[in-house]
């Protein structure tokens, strides 16, 4: 009976440690925008975008544009040109 309790405790401890290390590795692999580009990007070089929200993982709100050359470029979602490009890309997707 004593051996069974020790095994159960060991299994519970190992589970907690495994969950702890898995959650740490996911957070450290997450890329966040730390600053915005100063350049205005032309929509013809862009293939898509995502939105980054400021939360416990990332410090700033951003629109992340993806280029044909597979680059990710962070832009300020408050800028007029960013809103226009997001609208254009959204319209492009709707037409597909």
From Swiss-Prot:
Cysteines paired by S-S bonds: 32-58, 33-74
SUPFAM superfamilies xref list: Interleukin 8-like chemokines (SSF54117)
Record keywords, A-Z: Chemotaxis, Cytokine, Disulfide bond, Inflammatory response, Secreted, Signal
Signal peptide span: 1-26
Alphabetical list of SMART domains matching this protein: SCY
Transferase is among the record's keywords: no
A single BP term in Gene Ontology: immune response
Subcellular location: Secreted
Record family assignment: Belongs to the intercrine beta (chemokine CC) family.
PANTHER family (alphabetical): C-C MOTIF CHEMOKINE 20, SMALL INDUCIBLE CYTOKINE A
Protein name, per record: C-C motif chemokine 20
Source species of the chain: Bos taurus (Bovine)
């Amino acid at each position: 009976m004593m051996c069974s309790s020790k095994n159960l405790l060991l299994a519970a401890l190992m589970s907690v440690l495994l969950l702890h290390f898995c959650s740490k590795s996911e957070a450290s692999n997450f890329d966040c925008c730390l600053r915005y580009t100063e350049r205005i990007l032309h929509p013809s070089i862009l293939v898509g975008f995502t939105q980054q929200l400021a939360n416990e993982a990332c410090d700033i709100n951003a629109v992340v544009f993806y280029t044909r050359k597979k680059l990710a470029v962070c832009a300020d979602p408050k800028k007029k040109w960013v809103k226009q490009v997001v609208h254009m890309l959204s319209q492009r997707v709707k037409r597909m």
